Amino acid sequence: MQIESDFLVIGSGIAGLSYALQAADHGKVALITKKEITESATNYAQGGIASVFSEEDTFDSHSEDTMVAGAGICHEDVVKMVVEEGPDVIKTLIEWGVNFTTRGDSYDLTREGGHSKRRIFHADDLTGREIERALVTAVFEHPNITVYENHTAIDFITERKIAKKQEVKNRCFGAYVLDVLGNRVKTFLAKITLLASGGAGKVYLYTCNPDVASGDGVAMAYRAGALIANMEFMQFHPTTLYHPEAKSFLISESVRGEGAILRRRDGTPFMEKYHKLKDLAPRDVVARAIDNEMKTYGDGCVYLDITHMDPDFIKTRFPNIFRTCLKFHLDMTKEPLPVVPAAHYLCGGVVSNINGETTITNLYAIGEVAFTGLHGANRLASNSLLEAAAFAGRAYRHSSERLTTEQFSFPTIPAWDSGTATDSDEMVVVSQNWDEIRRFMWKIGRAH
């Protein structure tokens, strides 16, 4: 079965949805997503999206914070572009229906680790869910977008793959996609293909990523011949809830931004010996500090304490975190929360330029799956949603212009060849291998 469109979008987080909404004004869009359309890392993002807004803040300050967090290997031109497009990104999201939290007649900006100013737009502590809600609503209302849920991309369709010759120009014509419920592989042909499949947190034993973040977008691009870079830079979020019944529940960095303090089991604060910003140090610093404290004292976790703040403020500012912790009989207004680091964000990925182009013609990559140069070795808090939305706009403008100025035709595309392999009757073998890989990656990550 072949499905043709002008644009094929793989992924339904802020990157894919933002691109689809803009591309749909220029042509037909097919959007595929592994599970339900809302099952993305965006939907789980709590903290917010960073952008210069107040008169006390500047683009230079935001850029400097970004490059310091990135350990000096950020691409300065990309940092400058993304930071300066921040206000327009916020404006566009608001126009699409995103309701950011306000205070009086302005927006309630918060601060997170590594930021020198309050510049984080948020929707309580469910910012990602609010963004996803607004964008999904707009996507379903657009007549030029067709959404295919429970569809998993398997391989890109490229000219080299078809011709079986490395010397031919490597162009992308779409992807082979598994219809999970129908148990068949479909051929999605498109003039422009956008990869926005997210990260690879599920490669690690402990992660705050959803199950769909398994890294297959990077793997597909690698098999197709795209350039991949900086895969060693996996960011670990410092504070996920340490509880046997809590599945990878993240405690937002904005909790520390509002005054929470990291403590040892005996109540001693420890971040002052690791960084001058103490609990507001960049994520990599805080995560390593927590890991070191756990190893030094033989503890399974450390504690995040915000009990010195007004209980009503805590409940109002962090309603989702407060309610979720109560389910596990933890009252953050009265007791510190046990927390540990977990795999959170892939700073490397598929190499893409300032317009989202990869090294394969007509294949674009944006969002967490891409390495754009913004984050360097370590992402600054709340820069991911900003990057995804900014690059969605740039990729749309560049790719839509290509549609206008170039002639497109599809060669004869062979049907998917499933080969002679058969499904294993013993799924426990797959599960065991997957578990061993995740344990190995976690062990290696902690060792370094």
Which positions does each model-derived feature cover?
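An anion/pyrophosphate-binding glycine-rich loop and adjacent beta-alpha core
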Residues: 37, 220, 226-331, 335-337, ...
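N-terminal Rossmann-like FAD-binding beta1-loop-alpha1 element of flavoenzymes
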Residues: 7-31
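Conserved redox-cofactor binding core of oxidoreductases
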Residues: 95-184, 189, 196, 240-243, ...
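Short beta-strand to alpha-helix junction loop
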Residues: 74-87, 119-137, 148, 207-215, ...
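Glycine- and aromatic-enriched mobile tails/lids
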Residues: 3-5, 22, 36-38, 44-50, ...
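Core beta-strand elements of the Rossmann-like FAD/NAD(P) dinucleotide-binding domain
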Residues: 2-5, 182-192, 359-362
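A glycine-rich dinucleotide-binding beta-alpha-beta segment and adjacent secondary-structure elements
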Residues: 149, 154-171, 178, 317-370
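Glycine-rich active-site loop/strand segments that organize a redox cofactor
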Residues: 51-82
